[in-house]
């Protein structure tokens, strides 16, 4: 047991972690250190310290890690081009290993023997938190109340919170599970659990619904240096400010909504609606620049790496040796990913409107349909003969066997 010991709780101020504080104190008789890791939740953090203390925590940490989140988690994943199942830009998945890292640091500082989290027994986050924590310190005990307590639903949690006098931002009428950070906002649960239900127009927090976006397109220029975005519309911005600026630009144009029925690591499908405005622009721009500067073989192989990278991040294997090895490969591919991309935004759509780079592999003189002096079209005949030689030999051999069969009357 942990009677009298310190337990660090990954505290968000939401429904799950709000009821965990009194539950842990009741069942473990332990001291609760609430740790809120700020990855860009915004207004959610305004009263979080007072709320945690009122709920029974003895101490509260609020760690601002937004810059680290962007530099060490978002940008590497962006450079890798990692997208899970074609839509999900990994906003929650990237944040969890960073949160786990900070929880371990706080546990070491406080001399805590255990870390608790509010992830459910049906979701991916329990895996991400626990695998990451044990990759950093395998001696730390982990408590996952959702897997052991008698509260079987969010309705039960609401009733428990009311019984304990804990203020919560959720009602039984609006019961979405929301994860919010600098990179995205995710919505799950409630009426979204039926894939046939269209998301309600008031669901979105940071994106204007496309049908309500401006009737005129807006252009945005994004400049990259070695795969990292550094300027927006010609203005150099620090990483966090850059994401915030692109969130505003894309959001007002209805850009960045992804509605996905995804395959969870634990074996079931789930439906999530994601708002990732800045991420949608950055991924689109980064890919257009790679089309211009990467050679064919590197680009094709990087597509394979991107998928594996996405799986590793989604599955909670951020601190794995394979992910580190893939980072080294990705870093090599980004040496020439420098240039400017112009995007046209219109009612939820992102359209490439121009790209340029000092490392461009595109040569207009070679591909022009007009007169040129660098490409002899007669050379194509020899190339075609060699390129198709294996098929030609196969056809000749089949014809020869057919003639032999006919000669012997087969």
Curated annotation (Swiss-Prot):
Pathway: Amino-acid biosynthesis; L-arginine biosynthesis; L-arginine from L-ornithine and carbamoyl phosphate: step 2/3. Its EC number is 6.3.4.5. ATP binds at residues 10-18, 118. Its main location: cytoplasm. L-aspartate binds at residues 120, 124-125. GO terms for biological process: argininosuccinate metabolic process; L-arginine biosynthetic process; urea cycle. It comes from the Bacteria. CDD domains: ASS (cd01999). This is Argininosuccinate synthase. PANTHER family: ARGININOSUCCINATE SYNTHASE. InterPro entries: Arginosuc_syn_C, Arginosuc_syn_N, Arginosuc_synth, Arginosuc_synth_CS, Arginosuc_synth_type_1_subfam, AS_cat/multimer_dom_body, Rossmann-like_a/b/a_fold. The keyword Nucleotide-binding applies. The lineage of its organism: Bacteria, Bacillati, Bacillota, Clostridia, Thermoanaerobacterales. Homotetramer. L-citrulline binds at residues 88, 93, 124, 128, 177, 186, 262, 274. GO terms for molecular function: argininosuccinate synthase activity; ATP binding. Belongs to the argininosuccinate synthase family. Type 1 subfamily. Gene3D superfamilies: Argininosuccinate synthetase, chain A, domain 2, HUPs, Single helix bin. It catalyses: L-citrulline + L-aspartate + ATP = 2-(N(omega)-L-arginino)succinate + AMP + diphosphate + H(+).
